């Protein structure tokens, strides 16, 4: 069994995966003074006892690294996964300064399409001979030889744009869930690389760019993934791309607030921190592991 948690952090992203193996994964950071103590406390508690912890930064846009310095000071990031980049910003926040420190440190591992790493997607023993198991995470993008991607890396180096250096992350739990994150990839860029990314049936898709119209997913990708649920981020209603996915079930984070996915063999049970949130496409299996169960789905 594993737990996927999507925090409600406004116009930003922050997640963790508590794996059934000896792994704990955090994806992106968006903290504020009013939420940071509670979120950090939860992450500290949930990662207790895990031998391998990693933080994956999809890209260095401000709402994905917000208060990363505070988070790192409190949690202590030991393994920092990011795409290889030389992003700069004219006005450097403490968050971006910490991102650069981690990016350029010995803690960094540069992710790319098809990369292998022990305990990320390879099993193996630790230095004491203990078998830790794989996290089930694979990186589907970027292809670092792709010319369109190289152009986006240059924009990041010039400090003009960062969204399209986002990596695509896939998490697979054996006989259970497949989930995909796409950072803040934008529609035009996704269209330019749509034949370069190998996707498959997906149960939970976290919509790129917080569910904005600017992150509309290519139809070819949607057809291939055929997601059971698309989680729409907290984009403003005027920017939301909700109407572009009429044939897919959706959970709106701006209504559901924190979303917890309890993933077990053949099933995903879903909980919302909003006790009044409902999702009529889910079945009721009367689960109660967490507060405010909203339903389950077969996977």
Residue ranges of model-derived segments:
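Active-site metal-binding motif and surrounding structural segment of the metallo-beta-lactamase
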Residues: 25, 33-87, 196-212, 223-230
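Stable alpha-helical elements in mature extracytoplasmic
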Residues: 35, 39, 64-67, 92-102, ...
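Divalent cation-coordinating acidic motifs and surrounding scaffolds
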Residues: 56-60, 64, 82-86, 92-95, ...
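Core dinuclear metal-dependent hydrolase active-site scaffold
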Residues: 1-50, 113-201, 257-299
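Active-site environment of divalent metal-dependent phosphoester hydrolases
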Residues: 11, 32-34, 60-65, 87-90, ...
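Long, structured stretches of catalytic cores involved in phosphate-ester chemistry, encompassing
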Residues: 97, 197-260, 264-269
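Metal-dependent catalytic neighborhoods of phosphoester/phosphodiester hydrolases
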Residues: 65-74, 90-100, 217-220, 241-246
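Active-site regions of enzymes building and remodeling cell-envelope glycoconjugates
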Residues: 106-109, 117, 245-252
């Amino acid at each position: 069994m594993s737990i996927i948690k999507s925090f409600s952090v406004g116009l930003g992203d922050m997640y963790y995966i508590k794996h059934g193996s000896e792994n704990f994964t955090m994806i992106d950071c968006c903290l504020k003074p009013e939420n940071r103590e509670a979120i950090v406390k939860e992450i500290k508690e949930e990662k207790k006892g895990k031998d391998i912890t990693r933080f994956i930064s999809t890209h260095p846009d401000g709402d994905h690294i917000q208060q990363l310095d505070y988070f790192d000071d409190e949690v202590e990031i030991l393994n920092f996964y990011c795409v290889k980049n030389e992003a700069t910003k004219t006005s450097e926040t403490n968050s971006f300064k910490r991102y650069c420190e981690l990016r350029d440190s010995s803690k960094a591992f540069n992710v790319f399409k098809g990369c292998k790493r022990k305990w990320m997607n390879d099993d193996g023993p630790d230095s004491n001979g203990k078998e830790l198991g794989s996290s089930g995470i694979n990186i589907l993008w970027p292809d670092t030889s792709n010319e369109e991607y190289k152009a986006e890396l240059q924009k990041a180096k010039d400090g003009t744009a960062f969204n399209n250096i986002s990596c695509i992350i896939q998490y697979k739990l054996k006989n259970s869930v497949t989930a995909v994150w796409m950072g803040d990839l934008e529609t035009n860029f996704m269209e330019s690389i749509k034949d370069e990314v190998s996707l498959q049936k997906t149960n939970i898709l976290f919509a790129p760019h917080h569910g904005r119209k600017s992150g509309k997913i290519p139809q070819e990708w949607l057809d291939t993934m055929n997601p059971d649920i698309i989680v729409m981020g907290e984009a403003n209603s005027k920017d939301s791309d909700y109407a572009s996915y009429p044939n897919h079930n959706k959970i709106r984070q701006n209504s559901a607030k924190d979303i917890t996915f309890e993933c077990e063999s053949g099933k995903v049970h879903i909980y919302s921190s909003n006790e009044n949130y409902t999702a009529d496409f889910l079945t009721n299996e009367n689960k109660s592991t967490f507060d405010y169960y909203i339903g389950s789905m077969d996977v």
